[in-house]
């Protein structure tokens, strides 16, 4: 029997990517797509590339009706907007996957400090599971409320998890340098994402104050078993999709590149979407575009005693909607790669 799925906020980039993936998912049936801006329009009128794949009409949000008709509800809205839906899901015994930030941070005070929004569903935070399958698969399997990770945190945590789990680095030395495509800024109009502002340009933004910082530190700390503080600098690339993160850390003891690579291969053995690349091969965003893969490459700088790890993901797939569907598959007891398998487009 197909899993009945609804998407709240279907016409943003992450919502549309959910529709694209779920429209070809063999075990999912889309039953409702909500939007504030396009109610009454066919979804393919908003996103013509899905003409012939989806015939649903966009509708205004009616939480009781959505929960009644759905097994799983995805919320693809900006932070601050998932709390009412999560409360309704809790009341009706439905499962909800939030692609925003409302349930990622366990301390509501940290959330309110970084996002400048009051958290009105604090009672649900303890039961929310951080939806990074490679780290929390067992908890996701039993979850009713999944906080889908942010795009930058996904790339950073997957790059660092094996090192922290095996206590191979000095946790006070971590530097994360990430570059993202423009789709990470969303579909809304903003000066910083206009073509003439982005084209032939490359810039850092929100240096030392990006909202994903506490999320990265929280989850790295859970893996390490101790508090972790990082220096995180995001950059905007003049491309549509992709995140490339370069992570630097001081080794706790001397180790060679092949020794470190074996740690990664062992940690990610059996993972359907993490590809640890061979020696001499470093990830590129073009290799993962349109896929749920995370490619990881590494090297050891013996001169400085630092390990350098690079990870590449598609920010809209593994960094958002693909990972959300991966979480749905886990919750529903389906093979994790259902609807997600296969290479991307190249070139």
Curated annotation (Swiss-Prot):
GO cellular component terms, A-Z: cytoplasm
Alphabetized InterPro entries for the sequence: AGPR_AS (IPR023013), AGPR_type-1 (IPR000706), NAD(P)-bd_dom_sf (IPR036291), NAGSA_dehydrogenase (IPR050085), Semialdehyde_DH_NAD-bd (IPR000534)
UniProt superkingdom: Bacteria
GO BP, sorted A to Z: L-arginine biosynthetic process
Catalytic activity: N-acetyl-L-glutamate 5-semialdehyde + phosphate + NADP(+) = N-acetyl-L-glutamyl 5-phosphate + NADPH + H(+)
SMART domains associated with the record: Semialdhyde_dh (SM00859)
Main subcellular localisation: cytoplasm
Active site: 151
Top enzyme class: oxidoreductase
Cellular localization per UniProt: Cytoplasm
Pathway(s) annotated for this protein in UniProt: Amino-acid biosynthesis; L-arginine biosynthesis; N(2)-acetyl-L-ornithine from L-glutamate: step 3/4
Residues of the signal peptide: none
EC numbers, comma separated: 1.2.1.38
HAMAP family, sorted: ArgC_type1
Name the UniProt record assigns to this protein: N-acetyl-gamma-glutamyl-phosphate reductase
Species of provenance: Pelotomaculum thermopropionicum (strain DSM 13744 / JCM 10971 / SI)
